[in-house]
């Protein structure tokens, strides 16, 4: 239901990178930076999300909401990857964001997660994703994202 050029407010994530053993918190913990096992139950701050929704309404664009999955990349997903992600409840997928969220939450930093939808999932494998398509969607996404983030920053 999402389209290239949409912005999606991340309400939760599925961390497939860390499930594969690549946690940004591996190694010895520095207690002064945060707890060994940070709580990820509310990784994305409700207050910041509410502000983002209000700002996007003020700016007259639809801010989608959904669950983000993080994969290691750097490659686009296979049709089987995409079908699996759909079954487990993923709305958008990317190669970043989640490791940064984990580190931020480890440090006690509030997080607002927003994902730019750059291409449509091709579940049947008939239409390959092109890098040019992703770049073009970015041109649509950037002005909306910049204006929304400015609005959020002015309201916190």
Model-predicted segments: where are they?
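Glycine-rich phosphate- or other oxyanion-binding loops that anchor nucleotides, phosphorylated ligands
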Residues: 1-125, 131-156
């Amino acid at each position: 239901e999402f389209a290239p050029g949409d912005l999606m407010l991340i309400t939760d994530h599925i961390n497939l990178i860390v499930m594969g053993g690549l946690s940004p918190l591996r190694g010895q913990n520095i207690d002064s930076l945060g707890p060994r096992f940070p709580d990820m139950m509310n990784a994305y701050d409700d207050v910041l999300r509410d502000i983002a929704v209000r700002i996007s309404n003020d700016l007259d664009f639809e801010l989608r909401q959904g669950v983000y999955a993080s994969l290691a990349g750097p490659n686009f997903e296979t049709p089987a990857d995409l079908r699996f992600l759909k079954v487990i409840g993923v709305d958008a997928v990317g190669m970043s964001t989640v490791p940064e969220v984990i580190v931020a939450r480890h440090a006690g930093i509030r997080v607002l997660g927003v994902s730019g939808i750059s291409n449509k999932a091709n579940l049947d494998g008939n239409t390959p994703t092109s890098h040019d398509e992703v770049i073009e969607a970015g041109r649509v996404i950037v002005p909306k994202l910049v204006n929304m983030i400015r609005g959020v920053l002015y309201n916190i």
